[in-house]
Curated annotation (Swiss-Prot):
This is Probable gamma-aminobutyrate transaminase 3, mitochondrial. Its main location: mitochondrion. It is an enzyme of class 2 (transferase). It catalyses: 4-aminobutanoate + pyruvate = succinate semialdehyde + L-alanine; 4-aminobutanoate + glyoxylate = succinate semialdehyde + glycine. It comes from Oryza sativa subsp. indica. One of its GO terms (cellular component) is mitochondrion. Substrate binds at Y199, K335. CDD domains: OAT_like (cd00610). Belongs to the class-III pyridoxal-phosphate-dependent aminotransferase family. One of its GO terms (biological process) is gamma-aminobutyric acid metabolic process. The keyword Lyase does not apply. Pyridoxal 5'-phosphate binds at G166, S167, D306.
């Protein structure tokens, strides 16, 4: 059977792409000389579709596709998703896939939720668009702002600013923090600290905040005002005999040393995901955020919680801040806010910051930032309905009920010889493939182990996220127990097939 490989390779010529496609078609696997494979480090699954989509004669397209090697959109058949239903999506040839990533960590309520469709349709019929500039706005935007403020209970928040995505939310955070510090007469307090392996978006500023090399390389990033500190991944980065508690203490000390080196008067904010998502699903050590928050408070540095992935039930709590007792000054949300049915993101702003903006507005003038679609009435109407569903259907309790089996079922494969670590909580999981069960022994990059596993999953009708030799699962929050079992079964079958392929590659290597 033809292997639908997840090649994430760079190529300088279409002829090389064509030769790879021909090799896959002839042999069923990647050519072992594919030295460009390291470019796969931060690419999502980008399908080498040489089977089902070909039935419709679909090859190449007019899109410059996100996080996709340029030659793939010309030389390879894309996987074209045609419709969705519950936890499943279907391609244009009718093949069914369980969507074990919920789109991009986002379709929390699955596909084809009639209440969300009706909310959008009703609002389109009433008021399809009006802006929120100059103190003009719409009722859905006002209602949604109030609803979000009432749902966030980690601490009191003051105002909501609407964006269209998580990237825009984190980009806007920087401008808001700069505006705030200018209002306080602190023009030098402008630097941001983020973490290695973090993901905060792909705009110029949010990509700079992100700690993934692929978002910086060839884009002349990160911006000079962004600094990066340690990733809180205990399994990969702890010292010999270092406990999790000691590891967390060391990372907090390293953060403080970085602040002192740069000058506390220059550091404006620290941004962090409660659980790192695209960097490989990395939950922090238990006391990590307690120690980090103490350092930030000591030096009057704002804390931004990037809840774009973790908000609205993903971890088994309404917000990730609830899970780790985080008391942020600012919060970014998106994705599950509307279950991804309409583009929308938002910033939650603390009363302390909004009070400064209000009190200094006569001196500074208007907050001259926003987007045409900020608070779009249709997006807001859909988000309002999504938040109602989360509460009325007890989605948090549902996640808490099914998450243990999801976690235990996948983590049961931790003994695999190609698995280094399986980590996660709630309905989010990451698997890291390494040789010899050691974080210090990666597989040869040209083997593309994560991509091989992703291809095996896709062949079996399951879509996941691949990032180098890390793979991630983040299914819809509405998963049934039977669907959890389906994911576990397909994961196990794909893992066995990948183990066999790695054994073959090792045998050839000698």
């Amino acid at each position: 059977m033809i292997c639908r490989s997840l090649l994430l390779l760079r190529s300088n010529a279409a002829s090389k792409a064509s030769s790879i496609v021909k090799h896959v078609a002839a042999t069923g696997c990647l050519p072992e000389y594919s030295s460009e494979a390291p470019a796969r480090y931060f690419s999502s699954e980008s399908s080498l579709q040489v089977d089902s989509t070909e039935e419709n004669g679909f090859k190449g397209h007019g899109m410059l596709a996100p996080f996709t090697a340029g030659w793939q959109s010309t030389d390879l058949h894309p996987l074209v998703i045609d419709r969705s239903e519950g936890s499943y999506v279907y391609d244009i040839n009718g093949k069914k896939y369980i969507d074990a990533l919920a789109g991009l960590w986002s379709t929390a309520l699955g596909g084809n939720e009639p209440r969300l469709i009706k909310a959008a349709t009703d609002q389109l019929n009433k008021l399809p668009f009006y802006h929120s500039f100059w103190n003009r706005t719409t009722k859905p935007s006002l209602d949604l702002a109030n609803e979000i403020l009432s749902m966030f209970t980690a601490r009191e928040m003051g105002k909501i600013f609407f964006t269209n995505s998580g990237s825009e939310a984190n980009d806007s955070q920087v401008k808001l923090v700069w505006y705030y510090n200018n209002a306080l007469g602190r023009p030098n307090k402008k630097k941001f600290i983020a973490r290695s392996k973090s993901y905060h978006g792909s705009t110029l500023v949010s990509a700079s905040l992100s700690g993934l090399p692929a978002l910086h390389q060839k884009f002349d990033l990160p911006a000079p005002f962004v600094l990066h500190t340690d990733c809180p991944h205990y399994w990969r980065f702890h010292l010999p005999d270092e406990t999790e508690e000691e590891f967390a203490t060391r990372l907090a000390t390293n953060l403080e040393n970085l602040i002192l080196k740069e000058g506390p008067e220059t550091i404006a904010a620290f941004i962090a995901e409660p659980v790192m998502g695209a960097g490989g699903v990395i939950p922090p050590p238990k006391t990590y955020f307690e120690k980090i928050q103490a350092v930030l408070k000591k030096y009057d540095i704002l804390l931004i919680a990037d809840e774009v992935i973790t908000a609205f039930g993903r971890l088994g709590t309404m917000f990730g801040c609830d899970m780790y007792d985080i008391k942020p000054d600012l919060v970014s949300i998106a994705k599950a806010l509307s279950s991804a049915y309409m583009p929308i993101g938002a910033i939650l702003v603390s009363p302390e910051i909004t009070d400064v903006i209000y009190s200094q507005s006569n001196k500074l003038g208007s907050f001259a930032h926003g987007f045409t679609y900020s608070g779009h009435p249709v997006s807001c109407a859909v988000a309002i309905e999504a938040l109602k569903i989360y509460k009325e259907r007890n989605i948090i309790e549902h996640v808490q009920k099914i998450a243990p089996r999801f976690q235990e079922g996948i983590k049961a494969f931790s003994g695999s010889p190609i698995v280094g670590e399986i980590r996660g909580l709630g309905l989010i999981l990451g698997t890291e493939f390494v040789d010899n069960k050691s974080p210090n022994d990666p597989f040869p990059a040209e083997w593309g182990v994560g991509s091989l596993f992703g291809a095996e999953c896709e062949k079996r009708g399951m879509l996941i996220r691949v990032a180098g030799d890390n793979i991630m699962l983040s299914p819809p929050l509405i998963m049934t127990p039977d669907e959890v079992e389906e994911i576990i079964s397909k994961y196990g079958d794909a893992l066995k097939a990948t183990e066999e392929r790695i054994a073959e590659l090792k045998a050839k290597r000698g």
